[in-house]
Amino acid sequence: MSLGLQPNNDISSLVSSKNMTSENGLEHQFEELLVEKQYSEEHCAYCHIKNPNSILKCLHCNKWFCNVRGKSGASHIISHLVRARHKQVALHSHSSLSDTVLECYNCGTRNVFLLGFIPAKAKTVVVLLCRQPCARASIAKDMNWDLTQWQPIISDRQFLPWLITPPSEEEQKLAIPITSQQMVRLEELWRKDPNANLEDLDKPIEDDSLPSVELRYKDAHAYQAVLSPLIQAEADYDKRLKESQTQKDVVVRWDQAINKRYTAWFLLPKLESGEIRLAIGDEMKLTYEGELRAPWSSTGYVIKIPNNVSDEVGLELKRSDKVPIECTHNFSVDYVWKSTSFDRMQTALRLFATDGSRLSSFLYHKLLGHDIPPSFLKPKLPSDLSVPNLPKLNASQSEAVRAVLSKPLSLIQGPPGTGKTVTSASVVYHLATMQSRKRKSHSPVLVCAPSNVAVDQLAEKIHRTGLRVVRVAAKSREDIESSVSFLSLHEQIKNYKFNPELQRLLKLRSENNELSIQDEKKLRILVAAAEKELLRAAHVICCTCVGAGDRRISKYKFRSVLIDEATQASEPECMIPLVLGAKQVVLVGDHQQLGPVVMNKKVALASLSQSLFERLIILGNSPFRLVVQYRMHPCLSEFPSNTFYEGTLQNGVTTSERIARHVDFPWIQPDSPLMFYANFGQEELSASGTSFLNRTEASTCEKIVTTFLRSNVLPEQIGIVTPYDGQRSYIVQYMQNNGSMQKDLYKAVEVASVDAFQGREKDFIILSCVRSSEHQGIGFVNDPRRLNVALTRAKYGVIVLGNPKVLAKHALWYHFVLHCKEKGYLVEGTLNSLQKFSLTLTPPQKPQKFKRDLNVQRSLSPIQNAGSAMLPSFSNLPNLYSSSYLEEWNVFAQYKRRESNATDFEDFRSQVGDDESKFDEPTRF
């Protein structure tokens, strides 16, 4: 409550008071007034609760917040810290613990998301210690502390009540009510004006609404009018994010490579906490800010990112002159934001809208969603479509290849382990063979994918067939080794023997690390000519979707285009290769696995996270599905097949072929290597405050990995998958600190996100679900596509670690836990004495609002008329498995994206279980 008077008026009233006759009395009352005034302003910035025992001060912005749990499930102080990315707090001076700054007793860190407590020797005293490294037994051993009692000071996204008392019910009734949307809006206002308050929420909001992706468009101009603003919004967001990530006081060590270029090695604390993302080939700027020498800065490309072996980042500098290798401290690191990918998307949209020759008429209308008669090609195909040096095609693969070669637009759906890459390579082989017969109109086949890894994998397979393949990589990646480096354009130029002068200049530059201005100009001309010859002679050109906008490629026209992993590419990404003259297009992917990554939540809400592959399916373009899987033990494929693919997957491997009999592991059923291992550890917020970890599951991971290693399983055969970066980082550290085997063995075990494992496989997979709160949602774990990817990476065995009681409250996981229970895979106990876990399961009830919105969307959506094998009518869906849930989730997501505005995003995500995704990693649908 405020005093209701302005400060000047308060002082005037004191001075004019007849009762204040002594100077001491005046000073005393003046001080009391100032204290009262200050006290009245120290209230929760969200709801105005001001009980000193219930509020904390954010030391970053100096605002106060209470410990009451809001509608979002988190207390107001935690909601603020997470949204604002702040981490330090202090108690109120009038609280029972005084104005204490919460920090680690041992190292002084003030990151509250790292802090926990243990009882000290005195029973009435507790000690605050950070989770790592200070709560490790080796550090606290000498202090006689029982570290097994360490608990985080934040539980269920609320400070523990003995530390910060939650407001009473009476205080909460008097508090100003505030919704999650209003809190989000207030945080946005504070970024622009730190003095904004609740009254500012009533002011008119700037219209920053974005158009939503549509199913159909009148013409290409309308298409551009919708997608162009979304690309720009995503670019602006990415730019702000990258440019705000300057890191000071970086310590550097130096190394010089054979090419005489210097590499700077350093740690990035923000990277460790999950605040920023980094990829090979990213450009960064390194600046020296010390006093030992003159100011210096240089840019370079990232050649190494943190992994299980080392947390260091490697930055290879572009130039090697005047590098301060004698200095190691006082450096800063900045991201160098590049607009290249966004510019190329915008260019593709512009060309699509203004140049009618960029696509065939048929493809133009199909991409816009127009109803036009089907079109068929009449290629001369052999009876056996298998190709040289690749496995013989099975029936579904052969049918898919034959069908797509006779159509100008085709979709191939490749569920996990079904030989999608072999099928794609076979399609490309026949497309290239047909093109080579047309000598006058010969053009290479353009093969693209959204990621470099996917491009490399497909390029390697195509090369095996005997075709001439050229892999075009970005200039920033030319020095990065890959399995297909010998196919890269720049490597082929180095070995281009038809121009001795070119070879002489390349050798001279390699030896001297530079050329004269005249020789440099001459070399550029010779390289361009050689590139032209190599590209013209190629049967197949491989690059990323964004790479197709490279000037070396974009000046050519490509009649045939194949895009692999098309469901992971945004629609504008796909348009970059398509507008290079496409007349025949093949999109390959699986829309039941992970979709495109979109950083900006508002852009994701506008459906830019929907791939072109998905939109075409909704429009009625049925994909050709590959149905024989060659990866998983049959017991591992059963649930994914029934849940995500209507039971259509067939096993191309037998049980005996997928039993690792030499591995001594306590499977509850030796011939069925699938296990849901019940773990009931507490979930905790990670150091970033935006991700989660579970120490119990991390400990179990280490025990399982150690058991495998003792059974002579190679560490490279084991993969640990988790949806949360906080858990990934903690597992890596935990195995290093607590594993009983050699540390190098644990370093070689890959621990990564679900996203990082898509398209890959391991012999054994451990899935750590992390989420275990009775009061919160289960977040990313509830995404059907993530579960599908996680369960389908292993060949010989899967172990799922999680809390079945919590997970089974959600429809998708209810069916998986039920499946495991009925099959006898649900277990509990120690690893050397596992037993079946008896659990009573009750089918979860969907919220009525979910059902109501779903019914509305069913009446509106064209999905039910799509005619796709992947989208059956709702009435015919199986009851036992969660296919219905998967389709409902997707339909509901589409409906909410189209019908909601940006402020509805939190409620939308919470209804589908991802209530904290607004704080976590980028949106990936």
Swiss-Prot record:
List, in alphabetical order, the Gene Ontology terms for molecular function in this entry. Answer: ATP binding; ATP hydrolysis activity; double-stranded DNA helicase activity; RNA binding; RNA helicase activity; single-stranded DNA binding; zinc ion binding
Segments of this protein annotated with the region C4: 104-134
Keywords per UniProt? ATP-binding, Cytoplasm, Helicase, Hydrolase, Metal-binding, Nonsense-mediated mRNA decay, Nucleotide-binding, Zinc, Zinc-finger
Reactions catalysed? ATP + H2O = ADP + phosphate + H(+)
Chain residue ranges for the region called CC/SHH/C = 58-86
Gene Ontology cellular-component terms for this entry are:
cytoplasm; cytosol
Listed Basic and acidic residues bias regions: 915-925
Q: Where in the cell is it found?
A: Cytoplasm
Q: Where does ATP bind?
A: Q397, G417, T418, G419, K420, T421, Q593, Y630, E761
InterPro entries for the chain = AAA+_ATPase (IPR003593), DNA2/NAM7-like (IPR045055), DNA2/NAM7-like_C (IPR041679), DNA2/NAM7_AAA_11 (IPR041677), Helicase/UvrB_N (IPR006935), P-loop_NTPase (IPR027417), SF1_C_Upf1 (IPR047187), UPF1_1B_dom (IPR040812)
The record ties this protein, via SMART domains, to: AAA (SM00382)
Pfam hit, one: UPF1_Zn_bind
Q: Where is the signal peptide?
A: none
Could you state one GO biological process linked to this protein? nuclear-transcribed mRNA catabolic process, 3'-5' exonucleolytic nonsense-mediated decay
Which residues belong to any copy of the Upf1 CH-rich domain? 36-193
* Region Disordered, annotated ranges: 906-925
**Gene3D superfamilies registered for this protein in UniProt:** 2.40.30.230, 6.10.140.1240, P-loop containing nucleotide triphosphate hydrolases
Q: Indicate the enzyme's highest-level EC class.
A: hydrolase
- Annotated Zn(2+) 1 binding lies at C44, C47, C66, H76
Residues bound to Zn(2+) 3 are: C104, C107, C130, C134
Superkingdom to which the source organism belongs: Eukaryota
> In the Enzyme Commission scheme, what number(s) does this protein have?
3.6.4.12, 3.6.4.13
**Region of interest (C3H), ranges:** 44-76
What family is it from? Belongs to the DNA2/NAM7 helicase family.
Protein role: RNA-dependent helicase required for nonsense-mediated decay (NMD) of aberrant mRNAs containing premature stop codons and modulates the expression level of normal mRNAs. Also capable of unwinding double-stranded DNA and translocating on single-stranded DNA.
This chain belongs to which protein, by name? Answer: ATP-dependent helicase upf1
Give the originating organism: Schizosaccharomyces pombe (strain 972 / ATCC 24843)
